[in-house]
Amino acid sequence: MARMDRDAMIAAISTVLAATPDPEGTSDLVAERGHINVAATAAELKGAVQRLAPLRGYRWIVINAGDLFTAGPATLGTKVGILDPTGRVLKAADLPRAK
């Protein structure tokens, strides 16, 4: 699959997951699966994960599959899952523990 830019990734994942823009603006998108941020480049990964940290429920980042080896370490210990633009789960998300 060719590398996608941010707009193409948002369009693709929105179609696959029936995701809509987050009305509160805390994440890029919201779907039945939870909050979703899009990281089209490796440089956007850290910020995308950090913006999801305070949110409750399942949290996901969408990446180009070629960025998996960069995204994996960025999500360690965060319980944030990783999806590709087709909706394929590259790393499962988990619910944050209650504090």
Regions found by a protein language model. Name each.
Residues 39-85:
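Catalytic cores of nucleic-acid endonucleases
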Residues 78-99:
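Charged, structured surface patches that assemble and position nucleic-acid processing machinery
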Residues 28-31, 92-94:
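Short, solvent-exposed polar/charged micro-motifs at secondary-structure junctions
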Residues 1-30:
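Acidic-basic catalytic patches of nuclease active cores, encompassing PD-(D/E)XK
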Residues 30-40:
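Short, basic, glycine/proline-bearing loop/turn elements
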